[in-house]
C-alpha cells in the first residue's frame, strides 16, 4: 500500500478505476437497454454497440500524440470529463421512444473519453514505479480495472433495479384492478415454480 503515497500512482489508478467503472457498468446497461427496451436481439444489440468499440480504438491509438502535445495530466482529465459528458448524454437521451442515433452519439462520446484516458493512465502507473517493480505496477493496473468494472456493474445495476422497482410500484398503483391481480398471481406462480427443474 505504500505505493499509493505516490500522487502520480494514486491518480493514475483512480483514473483507471473510474474508466472501468463507467465501461463495465455501461456495457451491463447497454445490452439490457437495447434488448429489453428497444427489442433488439442479442446479436443486433451487440452490433449496435460497435460504434463504442470503434471510437475507443480510434481515441486510444491517438492518446500518445495527445499526451505529447498537451501533457498527460490534461489528457487524462479531459478524457474523464468527456467520459462523463458521454454518460450524461446517454442518461438524458435513453428512453423508450428515443432514437438509436442518440444512443450511438452518447456511446461514441463516452468511448472517446475512455480511450484517451486508459493508455496514459496505464503508462503513468508503470512510470511511477522503479523498473524492478514493473510486475507490481502491472498487477495493480489489472486489479484496478477489475475493481472498477465490478463496482460499475454493482452500482449501476443497483440504481437501475431500484428505479425499476419504484417505477413498477407506481405503474401498478395506476393500473386496473385486474392487472394488479394478474401480477400477484404471476408472482405466486414464479415462487411456486422457481425451485423446480
Locations of the language-model features?
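Transmembrane core module of solute transporters
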Residues: 1-132, 136
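Hydrophobic transmembrane architecture of multi-pass small-molecule transporters
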Residues: 123-124, 140, 144-197
